[in-house]
């Protein structure tokens, strides 16, 4: 039997992605065991994040400044805008180091089943940004799911009147992927996105 404080810690940890009740219990135990070296610094870091981290008013990224460091970076290409589902998508793009433009975070995907419509996403602010003559290309980097592709098509339609090129990420065979390990949809997408050598 554990005390109410530890039980609450376990319950909160189990709400994190990838942590079920067992993993949360192990994590809580480790935190309590390493109180001075782990629990106290983690609690301070979480308090600091709760107090200082905010959503960028331009792109939707999380940062301690507004606009965020990406939007404020004058070395980034102002002509390219990458549209992502959420901040996790933005961080994934940044991790590659291959995109040097700016971002627009939608805050989700269209989903009739979940009751998420266009008004629930950052589409209006994206369309307003697309009217900036400095922006010449918008890359739709939504997931290769039904909801992701539905959202991409809707956004592309909304951007059609704007004077920008709208492109999407290629889908298909991952680097190091073998054909016999891929599903039919991935192989079909790879065939459609083929390129000339």
UniProtKB/Swiss-Prot annotation:
A zinc finger (C4-type) spans 56-71. This is Recombination protein RecR. Residues 79-174 form the Toprim domain. Keywords: DNA damage, DNA recombination, DNA repair, Metal-binding, Zinc, Zinc-finger. The keyword Metal-binding applies. PROSITE patterns: RECR (PS01300), TOPRIM (PS50880). The gene is recR. One of its GO terms (molecular function) is zinc ion binding. GO terms for biological process: DNA recombination; DNA repair. InterPro entries: DNA_Rcmb_RecR, Rcmb_RecR, Rcmb_RecR_Znf, TOPRIM_dom, TOPRIM_RecR. The keyword Metal-binding applies. It comes from the Bacteria. Pfam families: RecR_C, RecR_HhH, RecR_ZnF, Toprim_4. NCBIfam families: recR. Gene3D superfamilies: 3.40.1360.10, RecR Domain 1. It comes from Paramagnetospirillum magneticum (strain ATCC 700264 / AMB-1) (Magnetospirillum magneticum). May play a role in DNA repair. It seems to be involved in an RecBC-independent recombinational process of DNA repair. It may act with RecF and RecO. Belongs to the RecR family.
């Amino acid at each position: 039997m554990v005390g109410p404080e530890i039980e609450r810690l376990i319950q909160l940890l189990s709400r994190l992605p990838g942590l079920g009740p067992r993993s949360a219990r192990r994590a809580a135990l480790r935190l309590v065991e390493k109180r001075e070296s782990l629990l106290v610094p983690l609690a301070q870091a979480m308090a600091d994040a709760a107090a200082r981290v905010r959503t960028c008013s331009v792109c939707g990224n999380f940062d301690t400044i507004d606009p965020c460091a990406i939007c404020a970076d004058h070395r980034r290409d102002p002509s390219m805008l990458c549209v992502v589902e959420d901040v996790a998508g933005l961080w994934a793009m940044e991790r590659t180091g291959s995109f040097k433009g700016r971002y627009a975070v939608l805050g989700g995907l269209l989903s009739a089943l979940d009751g998420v419509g266009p008004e629930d996403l950052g589409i209006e602010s994206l369309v307003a940004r697309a009217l900036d003559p400095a922006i010449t290309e918008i890359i739709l980097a939504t997931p290769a799911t039904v909801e992701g592709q539905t959202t991409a098509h809707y956004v592309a339609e909304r951007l059609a009147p704007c004077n920008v090129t709208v492109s999407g990420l290629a889908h298909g065979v991952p680097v190091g992927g073998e054909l016999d390990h891929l599903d039919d949809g991935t192989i079909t997408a790879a065939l459609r996105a083929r390129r000339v050598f």
